[in-house]
Regions:
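Terminal low-complexity/charged segments
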Residues: 1-196
Length: 196
C-alpha cells in the first residue's frame, strides 16, 4: 500500500527558534489571504454612524477612536450636557457605566470621561466614552445627573479623586477619603504620597 500524499495541503512552517532575529522569526505570508475581502462588520459600522451623528451635529467634536461597539468622542468645552441629552434621547444611550477623570498635567487640563451604555435593540452592549476637557485651575463641568441618574456616585468619586467640580451636583462630600482630607486629590499627577 502506497502512503498518501498531502501535497494539496500547505506545509506548516516550523515555529521560530528561541532567540531568533525578527527576520528569522517571520512566518511566510499567504499571498491569497492579502487579497481576501474584509468581512462587513455591522457593529463597527454602527459605531462609526453614531460618531458621525455626534460630530456632524456638534461642530468641534472629535472622534478619538472607534472599535466594534466601542467609541470615544471628545466635545468642546461647555457642550457636554447637550451632547449627553442627544446621546440619550436620539442615539439610545440609556444608562451610565462609570465616570472617570484623566489628569493631562502637561496640557494643564483635566478630562472627564462618561462611559455610557445602550440597551436599545440592535445596539445592545454599545459603549460611548463621552469626554470634555477643562482647565486644571478651573475644573468645573456640569453634572449629568439629570441626564443619567446613575452618574451621581460616579461624579462624586471623580470629584474626590481628581478635583473635578460637578456644577449642580447635590452632594460632593467624600466617599473614600477622610472627611478632613486637605491635600491634593490623590489621582492628580502632582500629588505626592506621604513617605515617598
Amino acid at each position: 500500500m502506497k502512503p498518501t500524499s498531502k501535497a494539496s495541503e500547505p506545509a506548516t512552517p516550523a515555529p521560530p527558534q528561541v532567540g531568533a532575529s525578527p527576520q528569522q522569526a517571520k512566518v511566510p505570508s499567504n499571498p491569497s489571504s492579502a487579497a481576501a475581502p474584509v468581512a462587513p462588520n455591522p457593529d463597527l459600522d454602527r459605531a462609526k454612524d453614531i460618531a458621525g451623528r455626534i460630530t456632524s451635529k456638534y461642530p468641534g467634536s472629535k472622534l478619538e477612536w472607534v472599535k466594534p461597539r466601542r467609541l470615544k468622542v471628545s466635545v468642546p468645552l461647555g457642550i457636554i450636557k447637550d451632547v449627553a441629552f442627544f446621546a440619550r434621547d436620539s442615539l439610545g444611550f440609556d444608562h451610565i457605566g462609570t465616570v472617570s477623570g484623566v489628569d493631562w498635567i502637561a496640557k494643564s487640563s483635566l478630562e472627564v470621561v462618561y462611559f455610557v451604555g445602550s440597551t436599545t435593540p440592535g445596539q445592545e452592549g454599545f459603549v460611548l466614552a463621552l469626554s470634555e476637557s477643562v482647565p486644571r485651575d478651573d475644573p468645573v463641568v456640569p453634572t449629568l445627573i439629570d441626564v443619567w441618574r446613575g452618574a451621581e456616585y460616579h461624579e462624586r468619586e471623580t470629584h474626590e479623586m481628581f478635583g473635578l467640580n460637578f456644577q449642580g451636583h447635590p452632594d460632593q462630600s467624600h466617599l473614600f477619603l477622610p472627611e478632613d482630607w486637605n491635600d491634593l486629590p490623590p489621582l492628580r499627577k502632582d500629588y505626592v504620597s506621604p513617605g515617598r
